[in-house]
């Protein structure tokens, strides 16, 4: 019985590989993103059709997929809102990839996850990483460029003063008083 299932899985895998052959280049590009396996890349291509020209921007793709933040505003007050409904297969595959990316070491996506999870919670951080991945996929599919990771220290390099203040604040909460002197 197990041998029959293994044979069926092998036959389906072979058929998927044959059907994905026209999208081999896009599949390889998508797999350069940390956390994305060939299975997730296949789901992304299958659900979007592999043609990103249908979506005018990455934001349109994210909204269609259901990983764009919801909006609930009344009388100038912004309230909590859920994400928009979208493609459940694509959201599921991206969720698995986002969780895998959040556990990778030294990547921008992991830094983004931990930065948002500490403030907003783990589920919102997963959705934010899903959107970042989908934006990267749209950009790679439209330009043909490979994924270039910004690095885990991206936010520190972007705003070094903020990182310095946060480190000082953390030391002060531990009971230390720090006097900064420029290095000579």
Annotated model-derived regions:
Residues 1-184:
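A detector of single, family-specific signature residues
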